Structures are given as structure tokens and as C-alpha cells.
Amino acid sequence: MGPSHIPPLTYKVVAECSVSKARAGLMTLRHSEVNTPVFMPVGTQGTLKGIVPDQLIELNCQILLGNTYHLGLRPGIETLKKAGGLHKFMGWPRAILTDSGGFQMVSLLQLAEIDEHGVNFRSPFDNSQCMLTPEHSIEIQNAIGGDIMMQLDDVVKTTTTGPRVEEAMERTIRWVDRCIEAHARDDDQSLFPIVQGGLDVPLRQRCVSALMERQVRGFAVGGLSGGESKHDFWRMVDVCTGYLPKDKPRYLMGVGFAADLVVCVALGIDMFDCVFPTRTARFGCALVDSGQLNLKQPKYKLDMEPIDKDCDCSTCRRYTRSYLHHIATNESVSSSLLSIHNVAYQLRLMRSMREAIQRDEFPQFVADFMARHFKAEPVPAWIREALSAVNIQLPADPERIDEQDQKPKTEKRRETEDVAEEQVASS
């Protein structure tokens, strides 16, 4: 059978949790097989900051994300076409997913305006006026040649209310039809529509229903993890997975905190992406089950342990916390070493969840993970509620009060995550 007869995406559920909505799957793409649930590191401009493709292969990364907005500006469509696509351009043999570019323009550019035609914005490089239409977004993504590509959607701030939310949802549906019409490589690239609707349950349901009428191979859930409360966040995820078809992959955009990943897998999500692992590495922070280690802190000066004794990444095999503390305060190379570890951590977390689902031990995995992650404080109420909604019960812990400012530690942790979310959104 020739390559043109191989479906560009097939998805099979290989195991399901008997309690929650978690499932393990196998997604077969043009360039590689991808085991789900999966975390996709973000290579904004065709590379992860501080990590080369060979290192990603060593970490057994099966799929990464490329940013259409940045790649469309630099190196540009002509360069990508001449190179034969992003895979050849960056020397990456495995799968790539590309976003549409809409989120970056609306969230990062002050002068972006949206109308029915598309997104009008000024280039950050030369201040020239630019227009990104659904058709142009698809043209760029066809040139990039990713295995999975996203429709251009009408993005509004998550906390927006009123008629603008419905307008954006309806426009997103109209735009997916324009994207499908413009898609010139359906035989080897799979286009995902994006579920929008803000924090409005009926709008989310309407959007899912409309998008399911289109002939697509998977679905993305957008417009979340952008400042809404965690209670609203998990409820919208739960609503979407409750209506999306079970035989196609579900991608939750822009989510990367470890606890969020575990909860959303329980709610039925298969795919995730976020810049968080590499961005937090540039601040000298390493990811572990209990949260983050800020290796710039003096307490690590004489700590001769690896970041995580259970991690087999090259950073943990070779370097101590003491050494990483030393270079974190002096050398930029530390961000590369920490990025390797942080990506390895995210990939290992996803692998552990897959294996637990396949053994039908996912609820116990969740309980054990949350006990480690919130070792010194109560599990936040939103996590208990979200897991309870899919029949995973966690014990309610007593609130512990920080004597310094009398704030519950859960509230202080949430403030820290808010800062991290702002950093992620600005990257």
C-alpha cells in the first residue's frame, strides 16, 4: 500500500479506566505513533528553547508543537516550502502539531482586531499591517507540514461575558468551514476544529454539536486556562469531554501544570501542550512530584542529590542540585539542563498515567500523586470536586494556616500558580 493510501491519523482506545473518564490510546500519524494521554512540548519557532531534536528523541518525545504565527513570520512560507516542511527544516523525524496562530495575535498583540474576514494586526518586527484569515492560516500550516493542524478560531479572553462570547463561538464554527475548504493536504495532514464558548455551558454544547457535523479526525478544546477560576476550568473540560465523541482524540490547549494534567486526564482529555516546563526552567526551577524546586535558593548549595532520584534524564543522571544551583546563579546553560529535566518529568508523568490506566489502577495513581503533590497542604477543593465528578474520591484534608499572614496554604499556592500562568500566557 502506497503512502497516499495510509490514513493521516488513526486513533484507537486501548484501555479505559473503569471508574473515571480516563483512557489510554494509540494515535498513528504520518511521522510516528503517539501514545495517549500525551504532553506535547512547545517548539515555538521550530525548536524548544535549550533542547535540540536529538535530545527530545532521547527523552522519547513522540510529538511536539510548532507555532504557526511565529513560523509564518520567520522563517516564512517560502523558506518552509523550499526546505520541504518543518520536519526537514529542523531535523525532526517524529510528529508535529501546529496551532493556528490566532491565540498569539489576540493575547500578545495590543493592536489586533477581529472581524468576519480574519484577524488584523501589526507585525511586531516591522509594524506593517497584516491580516491572518482562516485561509492564510491553513496555507502556512500546509507549508509547515505538521501531522495535525488547528483551525483559526475567534479567541476571546476566558473571563469575557455577554454577546461577544456567542459571537466568537459562532464565528469559530463558520471559520472551520473556511479552513476545511482551504485545506490542500487532507491526505497527509489532519485538521482539528476548536471548541469555544467561554464559560457558558449551553454555548460549549452548541459548539461541540456543530463541530461534530464536520468530517474531522479529532477535536481541540480552547478558550480555557486563561484566568478563569479552577472550578470553572474543570467544569468546562468535563462538559466538553461529556459531549465529544469517544472514538476521536481530544486536545486541551495550553494546559501544563502537573495537577491539572492529572485531573484533566481523569476528565477524559488525551492531548496537552504548554510552554510551562521550559519557561519555568529559565527561572531556575525544576519540576518534581511535590511541585517545583527553585534551585537558585541557597538551601541547595550543599545538596548533592539529583533533582529527582527516580528520573533517568541526562540531567538527573549527571548533575547534583548543588551543581545546578551553582550554574543557575551564574550560567545560562542551567536553563538547558533544567529544560531537559522538566520535559522529561512531564513525559514521565504522562507515561505513568497511561500505564496506570492500562492496569486499571488509575484512581490509586491519582490518590498517590495528589498525596505527594500536596504533601504539606490540603488538596484544593476544586481538585476534589473534579475528581469526585468522575467517581474518584479523595479524602478531605483539614485546612492548614500559615502563621505569617494567616492565609491558607492552598490560597498562597494558588497565588504562585497565578503568577506562573501569567508567565506562560506572555511567552
Swiss-Prot record:
CC terms in the record's Gene Ontology section: cytoplasmic side of mitochondrial outer membrane; tRNA-guanine transglycosylase complex
InterPro entries to which the protein is assigned, alphabetical: TGT, TGT-like_sf, tRNA_ribo_trans-like
Binding site for Zn(2+): 311, 313, 316, 341
Documented EC number(s): 2.4.2.64
GO MF annotation terms: metal ion binding; tRNA-guanosine(34) queuine transglycosylase activity
Residue ranges of the region described as Disordered: 395-427
Catalytic activity annotation: guanosine(34) in tRNA + queuine = queuosine(34) in tRNA + guanine
This protein's UniProt keywords: Cytoplasm, Glycosyltransferase, Metal-binding, Transferase, tRNA processing, Zinc
This protein's record includes keyword Ribonucleoprotein: no
Cofactor(s) required for function per UniProt: Zn(2+)
Active-site residue list: 99 (proton acceptor), 273 (nucleophile)
Keyword Metal-binding included in the entry's annotation: yes
GO biological process: tRNA-guanine transglycosylation
Basic and acidic residues bias: start-end ranges: 397-417
Protein residues bound to substrate: 99-103, 153, 196, 223
SUPFAM superfamilies: tRNA-guanine transglycosylase
Name of one Pfam family that matches: TGT
Family classification: Belongs to the queuine tRNA-ribosyltransferase family.
Function according to Swiss-Prot or TrEMBL: Catalytic subunit of the queuine tRNA-ribosyltransferase (TGT) that catalyzes the base-exchange of a guanine (G) residue with queuine (Q) at position 34 (anticodon wobble position) in tRNAs with GU(N) anticodons (tRNA-Asp, -Asn, -His and -Tyr), resulting in the hypermodified nucleoside queuosine (7-(((4,5-cis-dihydroxy-2-cyclopenten-1-yl)amino)methyl)-7-deazaguanosine). Catalysis occurs through a double-displacement mechanism. The nucleophile active site attacks the C1' of nucleotide 34 to detach the guanine base from the RNA, forming a covalent enzyme-RNA intermediate.
Subunit relationships: Heterodimer of a catalytic subunit and an accessory subunit.
Protein name in UniProt: Queuine tRNA-ribosyltransferase catalytic subunit
Naturally occurring in which organism (per UniProt): Drosophila melanogaster
